[in-house]
């Protein structure tokens, strides 16, 4: 049995475990699903292998599913140099959902060509990091158990109240450890 602890998640922007996911839920005037912290040692396979690492999720999911990963942007907005998007990552061949997530990207940390590609939103950030040879550090801040709500259920094809696993991750510049992205990544039942 996995151990988890409840988090106090009342519409608190920049919550260390749910931001930027909470921003999209707040904008849609929808209550966040039940989200609890879980120790990485208690995450079952294959979720542990997919979440507990310091790599980008795009390449990790591509390797696991033996397919290229595509991006479907559900919502997006920009506030000066901060670009937010709510996304679904899909396998290319079957268009099967392999991740639901929310990301805040600090555009000014990227070269102009990469910035343009990020905002065009035709590829996942992980793919763009590789395409533009951008070095980064990936540092998961915590691991999550999410009780699937109707919204996530529709996206990830799971029943309400199903237990899903995810992580809260931050990407940093390797030289000065300045943040380049904040991410919540939620995996479907595999």
Walk through the language-model features, giving the residues of each.
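N-terminal domain-onset segments
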Residues: 2-84, 88, 95-165, 172-190
């Amino acid at each position: 049995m996995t151990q988890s602890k409840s988090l106090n998640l009342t519409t608190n922007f920049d919550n260390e475990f749910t931001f930027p996911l909470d921003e999209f839920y707040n904008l849609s005037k929808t209550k966040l699903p039940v989200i609890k912290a879980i120790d990485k040692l208690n995450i079952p396979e294959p979720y542990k292998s997919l979440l507990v690492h310091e790599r980008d999720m795009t390449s990790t999911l591509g390797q696991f599913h033996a397919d290229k990963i595509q991006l479907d942007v559900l919502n997006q907005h920009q506030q000066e140099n901060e670009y937010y998007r709510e996304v679904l990552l899909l396998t290319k061949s079957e268009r099967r959902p392999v991740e639901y997530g929310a990301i805040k990207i600090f555009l000014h940390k990227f070269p102009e060509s990469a910035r343009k590609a990020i905002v065009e939103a035709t590829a996942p950030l992980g793919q763009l990091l590789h395409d533009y040879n951008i070095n980064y550090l990936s540092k998961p801040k915590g691991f999550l158990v999410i009780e699937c709500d109707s919204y996530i259920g529709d996206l990830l094809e799971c029943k309400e109240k199903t237990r899903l696993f995810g992580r809260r991750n931050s990407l940093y510049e390797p030289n000065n450890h300045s943040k380049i992205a904040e991410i919540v990544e939620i995996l479907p039942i595999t």
